Amino acid sequence: MAGPEPPMPLSRGGPGSASLSPPRGDRTLLVRHLPAELTAEEKEDLLKYFGAQSVRVLSDKGRLKHTAFATFPNEKAAIKALTRLHQLKLLGHTLVVEFAKEQDRVHSPCSTSNTEKKKRLDDTVENDKEKKEPDILTVENGIAPNHGLTFPLNSCLKYMYPPPSSTILANIVNALASVPKFYVQVLHLMNKMNLPTPFGPITARPPMYEDYMPLHAPLPPTSPQPPEEPPLPDEDEDLSSKESEYESSDEEDRQRMNRLMELANLQPKRPKTEKPRHVRKKRKIKDMLNIPSSASHSLHPVLLPSDVFDQPQSVGNKKIEFNISTNMPAAFNKDLETQPNNEEENSDSPDTGLDSNTGFGKIFPKPNLNITEEITEDSDEIPSQFISRKELEKGRISREEMETLSVFRSYEPGEPNCRIYVKNLARHVQEKDLKFIFGRYVDFSSETQRIMFDIRLMKEGRMKGQAFVGLPNEKAAAKALKEANGYVLFGKPMVVQFARSARPKQDSKEGKRK
């Protein structure tokens, strides 16, 4: 039979457009992604419900599987059905509808009367092919023909995968990172399943199966038990050994399967995180001598024995001399004259009189001038909360030691301002330790000084082991730099400098303005 003659090209608005039907390409629709759960009759009824005159449902195999051609009476009906069917979600599938192209006209129905005949012929031909060639391997039935795996899937084979856990997901991630092809295929699969792309920020962790699974106690170790029956005699030894081997193998298989099932249900244990061992460094005598006492940890300063007890005065060898004058009677006369005057003076003060009458009187120690000076200097401080100047001087290293250390080689104090920069801090240092040292330069009774006092200790990143301390004024900052620079805190000497301030360069701006 010859194919149908193509229609005459006519203008849309010319005469005869209403009587002549439009070309078949304009009224035949190709419907893709039909659900596999529907039968051919149900698919045909579905498309006829939307106004199709003739429907041809293709087979579920091949290039055009799960597709159908639907021919409508006119172009308007085809357009209306396309708008209603396109992107329609049906049983979890999204339909894709488009006008049939010229290359697909071979598969499209020729007339309404031939649809059922061709459908029956196709079904009979396919059934004959399946009956005649059941063992022939085709590319469509193969697992992965591109990789050489052309054998079909076993229909009886069913996989029972365990639920996802943290260890399984970690192993999958490791496989993704090590096999680039696997990574690309996973991205393709996510794209086909309309999952969100993994290129953005980290998404929230979904609830895992292991979070809701009850914990099982581990199996106790099985202790070896003696055999219940004694060994048989030598004659039946071969038979008994064979029977016992069969029985033991069956029992071992059962026990092994039971243990595997119990272990599969057990929640995986988290691997123990071993703490890195800290290697103790050998301390030098120089560092051990300069280690400060535990005063930085306590609120009250440590009192030295010299602060509590009187220091013994060094008594030198005194020479005793006697000057005996020759005019003894005259001296006695003078003493007798002075005695009544002394008695009158002593009568006014009774305490002194008692002292003069009884022995030598009270002996008081000499006042220690150094202690009074230190008390007057530290009177402005709060020794119970902050470090004293004496402890600062004791904990500092000498200038000779500063020259030997690499931290102080290129030391410069910087431009004076109210903020100081502290570096070379130990990792155990906390903000309260810095407050214990630099709080002595702040008057906490003043609200302004209390607000200006600020400590920022860097504990992470490349600024680790450094701190910025804000003091009320430049005078306090200069005093803190002078007294605290080189103080050994937790075995490391502090390096104290003035912080760099971002001041505007007035000279350069004025030169530009000029």
Swiss-Prot record:
Residues 217-230 have a biased composition (Pro residues). This is RNA-binding region-containing protein 3. Participates in pre-mRNA U12-dependent splicing, performed by the minor spliceosome which removes U12-type introns. U12-type introns comprises less than 1% of all non-coding sequences. Binds to the 3'-stem-loop of m(7)G-capped U12 snRNA. Its main location: nucleus. The modification Phosphoserine is found at residues 21, 108, 349. GO terms for molecular function: RNA binding. GO terms for cellular component: nucleoplasm; nucleus; U12-type spliceosomal complex. It holds the Pfam family RRM_1.
